């Protein structure tokens, strides 16, 4: 009886683990700021093992943290907060300058190159379950435009 109960418990735990999406974060970074600057963006690659949505974020570096998108309309770039960013299973979604990103608003202090900014990313799966991924994003120079791996 005990062996059957244990086997059922292990099978149940395996099912729950399989149902939880695994999100991989690659090259997280934040653009550095000047002393009077009150906001910055965080950028990274996100890949999930199952369909999820990035629905929020938080960081001790900023009082407000939002998921944003950039779009161009009639030659004018516009930025706005969005309720969620879909991550299709197995596909990498890039958060990058000029596109989707995590916006850090009302910064607690300037972000200096070489520092690390902790960011908590919140995801929701198709089943409604929330999960959080903790990230440490490296602060890059104010003029940085993207991947440090990019070479000419």
Question: What does each of the following model-derived ranges do?
Answer:
Residues 22-152:
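Compact, glycine-rich, soluble single-domain proteins
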Residues 1-5:
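Positively charged n-region of N-terminal signal peptides that target proteins for export
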Residues 7-17:
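Bacterial N-terminal signal peptides
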């Amino acid at each position: 009886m005990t062996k059957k109960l244990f086997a059922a418990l292990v099978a149940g735990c395996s099912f729950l683990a399989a149902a939880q999406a695994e999100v991989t974060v690659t090259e997280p970074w934040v653009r550095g700021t000047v002393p009077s600057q009150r906001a910055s963006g965080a950028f990274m690659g996100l890949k999930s093992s199952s369909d999820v949505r990035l629905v929020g974020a938080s960081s001790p570096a900023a009082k407000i943290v939002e998921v944003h998108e950039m779009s161009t309309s009639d030659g004018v770039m516009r930025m706005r907060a969005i309720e969620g960013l879909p991550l299709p299973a197995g596909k990498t979604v890039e958060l990058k300058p000029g596109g989707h990103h995590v916006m850090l608003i009302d910064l607690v202090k300037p972000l200096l190159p070489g520092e690390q900014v902790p960011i908590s990313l919140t995801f929701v799966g198709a089943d409604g379950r929330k999960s959080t991924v903790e990230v440490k994003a490296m602060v890059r120079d104010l003029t940085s435009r993207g991947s440090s791996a990019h070479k000419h």
